[in-house]
From Swiss-Prot:
PANTHER family: PREFOLDIN SUBUNIT 4 (PTHR21100:SF9)
GO MF annotations, alphabetized: unfolded protein binding
Keyword Chaperone in annotation: yes
Family of the protein in this entry: Belongs to the prefoldin subunit beta family.
Protein role: Binds specifically to cytosolic chaperonin (c-CPN) and transfers target proteins to it. Binds to nascent polypeptide chain and promotes folding in an environment in which there are many competing pathways for nonnative proteins. Appears to play a non-essential role.
Keywords: Chaperone
Tagged with keyword Magnesium: no
A GO cellular-component term linked to this record: prefoldin complex
Example of a GO biological process term: protein folding
Superkingdom field: Eukaryota
Organism this protein belongs to: Caenorhabditis briggsae
Protein's recorded name: Probable prefoldin subunit 4
Alphabetized Pfam families for the sequence: Prefoldin_2 (PF01920)
Subunit structure: Heterohexamer of two PFD-alpha type and four PFD-beta type subunits.
Length: 126
């Protein structure tokens, strides 16, 4: 029978930190995916506005929150570009945070696997 390593308070703190980091990592991945989809949708909307003729581009409905606001094509393009820029900025921040969290999780994994070996499993099943 293999001897089991004792779990110290520091080890438990690392395990807890890893668990919290994993939850945050999962949340950040979902947020990044959502923001990437939003940027793609904005790009598609911008392309569609370019395809409109002069008559149709005079009043284009755009959903903001729970209501629709009518824009002309120039105003809508400005609105879409501003929305895209702000979304890309937030996406870059979230991606940076995700990379930092992932690096910290890898560091914690090395420490815990070094002490406990195959007695623990910290790898996500995907």
């Amino acid at each position: 029978m293999a001897t089991q390593a004792k779990v110290s308070a520091e080890d438990q703190a690392l395990l807890n930190k890893f668990a919290r980091s994993y939850q945050l990592q999962t949340q950040l991945k979902a947020e990044c995916k959502e923001m990437k989809t939003l940027v793609e949708n904005i790009n598609e909307a911008t392309d569609e506005v370019l395809l409109l003729d002069d008559e149709d581009s005079a009043s284009i409905p755009c959903r903001i929150g729970s209501c629709f606001v009518h824009f002309n094509s120039d105003s809508l393009n400005e609105h879409l570009e501003a929305k895209k820029a702000s979304t890309e900025t937030v996406l870059a921040e979230k991606t940076n945070e995700l990379e930092t969290i992932t690096a910290e999780m890898e560091r914690i994994k090395k420490v815990l696997y070094g002490k406990f070996g195959d007695q623990i499993n910290l790898d996500a099943e995907e």
